[in-house]
Amino acid sequence: MRKKILATTAMAAAAVLGLSACSGGDDATAEGSGELQIEVPDIAMQEELGDYEGEVNIVAWSGFVEAEWSDAFTDETGCVVNRRVAGTSDEMVQLMRTGDYDLVSASGDASLRLIAGGDVQPLNLELIPNFGDDIVEGMKGQIYDTINGKSYGIPIGRGANILQYNSEIVTEEPTSWDVAWEKDSPYAGQVIAYDAPIYIADAAVYLMAHEPELGIENPYALDEKQLAAAIDLLKQQNEIVSEYWSDPAAQITSFAGGTTVLGTSWEVLRKLTEDDKFKSVLPEEGSTGWSDAWMLATESKNPNCAYAWMDYASTPEVNGAIAMNFGMAPANAAFCETSEEAKAHCDYFHATDEEYFEKVWFWTTPIEQCIDGRSAEEATCTNFQQWTDAWLSVKG
């Protein structure tokens, strides 16, 4: 089964602590501008392509690199694709630091760690012609992979963390996350929640709508007071939660077996239940979500094959094949027009519905620089280590 589990280890936390604010924090902007200014290693961008080296070594989520399309890539380029499947973002970060891999399909909770650690290099988009107009705008220049005006990631796909429910018990579609957060929920004791420090952001999204006096503008930019409020809410939720999940298979089993009535999910997990009684909704408060991108190792031994792969994997056909195999919205919107099956997939995962994804706050590693626009003089935000420590207190 597919996993995207934010790691909680000290190594991951230490990596994030390397992210520090530049002077002039007023230059930092929020989601999607590509104007976040932080201190990162000054790594040169590749200027032109050379001869293919004969192989490319990729760390990827299960389902992203399969023989169905990688064999054709090898036939076209002579670059043999060597795949290593990773189960967590932390594992991906650690593997990329071994120097053995050229590419990684990083999620937003790993990308800033890799950029700040000097593990990945900025990309020359002119060498990736398929990164063009057909790539959905909502996946270009995002804060989690575009730093100081430089692009570090080529988008693959995205998804929202939605509210899933058993419609035989929850007979009216919920409009709010309150049924999963408030202690007077009629479904107390039958609620499932995600098990990772990044889930703190879900609490922050809820607080943005219900306690605006806290001043939360970005769920990944929490000062100490705001983090404390999120933890208080999570501890309240803990009293009504029957189960936490990090293994997607366990989440599906919990719903199918009747232990869980509602809670956090992904659209693909609802689909995999193969039971129409399970419905999903993106509540009025919005939600968190995830977005994956190809990132190139700074010390890549096979950069030309790696660039060729990023371009190849960005074609409508291959990007769409990855999206369908994994269960997510593709980055290349042109895929949606290739067949009726493709259109149905895109409709199911809201591939080109930017109004839908405008309500989604994609996973971003929390850092001390407040990425909501507050300057260093105005506030210091909490980092990943602090989130990790705080999360450990939630479940007791």
Where are these regions (language model features)?
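A bilobed periplasmic-binding-protein/Venus flytrap-type ligand-binding module shared by bacterial periplasmic
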Residues: Q164-I169, V205-L207, W290-N302, A321-N325
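A ligand-binding cleft/hinge motif common to bilobed small-molecule-binding domains
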Residues: A110-I115, G263-K277
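Early extracytoplasmic/lumenal segment of secretory-pathway proteins
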Residues: C22, G34-L114
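Conserved C-terminal helix/tail region of periplasmic/extracytoplasmic solute-binding proteins
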Residues: K359-G396
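Extracytoplasmic ligand-binding site segments that recognize negatively charged/polar headgroups
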Residues: F64-E66, S105-S254
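C-terminal motif of bacterial Sec signal peptides marking the signal peptidase cleavage site
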Residues: V16-A21
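Periplasmic-binding protein-like
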Residues: P129-D133, I231-Q237, D275-T298
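Mature extracytoplasmic/periplasmic domains
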Residues: A297-P366
